[in-house]
């Protein structure tokens, strides 16, 4: 028996060297096309970070109504939408404006997403462009046959009315995407309360970027126990809310400590008990044992329902000697609460305040004055492109 083990280890080393040379090959046969789309200011910031840290096998696309912000962003493709609506000055916090501007550019977006197999849509919920554009982009990608994953952040409670917009935007995105992963900005107050505001937001950008990078490279880079696009498709088609877990440890008790680290992720606020699907990928050094890898996968999926579909893989990298990293996506979380508890509470409070104010206006006899919007529509601004399959004038409303 010892001879068999020794021979297997010798063969393993030879196979690893052969695999290494194959990885350097330029043969891209069968590789899925992954596109990461950032909509609005927060989404663009994530795209900029992704572009700079690099994601193997994925294209980055930035979409915005704000020309100045878009100029500052680095991406493989940049699209300024709704130029005739906003003059490149942004959506003014109005999701309907962001939605309209993106619909007018759907021909261009279809071209960019044409043969994509997996599309990530990242945005900040609660503003104008991201909230309105993300569901439109998700719908276009879905109609063209791609698996669509939304990766979004929610506003601070102090932003009040924006939490209501965020809730509505999340519901719209959930209706169009296969799965959505939600991160709550309020958790930054607990995680990095004393960082300068710019650096605090960059932490959220980095977490979203690293998550998208991790998922993308899990299915584009070879592994010892491989995960591929078909596995991703199977898990993401479970639908509902998805929960992302990331953990890393150098502790001797890798099996439990890496799971503890993932469970205590500071920016995730959704309970995934009863989820119907799980995708787990483990990265470790040459010292990672089969028992440890299986133990990690088992521990991190124990909260899933008994009949959950779990797919796991493992990759060995020399730089991970003595440590281990786990990334898991739990899908099919059948929770009506997409926002975190604190954000949901603020959204409910803000909605009640808005409804009360509208009720008072109705009782006082005041009516909504739509003359300005009507005048805009009559002047033709709202008619160029419309909801046509392809916008009528690319040069007018889309700048790439």
UniProtKB/Swiss-Prot annotation:
Basic and acidic residues compositional bias, start-end: 1-16, 385-400
Record's subcellular location: Cytoplasm
Compositionally biased tracts (Low complexity): 352-364
One CC-aspect GO term: cell division site
Keywords: Cell cycle, Cell division, Cytoplasm, GTP-binding, Nucleotide-binding, Septation
Disulphide connectivity of cysteines: none
Stored Pfam families: FtsZ_C, Tubulin
Region spans: Disordered: 1-30, 338-400
GO biological process: cell division; contractile ring contraction; FtsZ-dependent cytokinesis; protein polymerization
Main localization, broad class: cytoplasm
Polar residues bias (residue ranges): 365-382
Amino-acid positions noted as binding GTP in the UniProt annotation, renumbered to this chain: 41-45, 128-130, 159, 162, 205
Molecular function GO terms recorded: GTP binding; GTPase activity
Signal peptide: none
Changes seen on gene knockout: Viable, but have fewer colony-forming units compared to wild-type. Cells are very heterogeneously sized and misshapen, and have a notable amount of cellular debris. Loss of cell division. No effect on Z1 ring formation. FtsZ1/FtsZ2 double deletion mutant cells show various division defects, including fragmentation, budding, polar tubulation and fission resulting in DNA-containing particles, which are able to remain viable and propagate without regular cell division.
Effect of residue 231 to A: Defective in cell division inhibiting ring constriction. Is not able to complement the deletion mutant of this gene
Complex formation: Homodimer. Polymerizes to form a dynamic ring structure in a strictly GTP-dependent manner. Interacts directly with several other division proteins. Interacts with SepF.
Family under the similarity heading: Belongs to the FtsZ family.
Record function comment: Essential cell division protein that forms a contractile ring structure (Z ring) at the future cell division site. The regulation of the ring assembly controls the timing and the location of cell division. One of the functions of the FtsZ ring is to recruit other cell division proteins to the septum to produce a new cell wall between the dividing cells. Binds GTP and shows GTPase activity. Required for division ring constriction.
Protein name (record): Cell division protein FtsZ 2
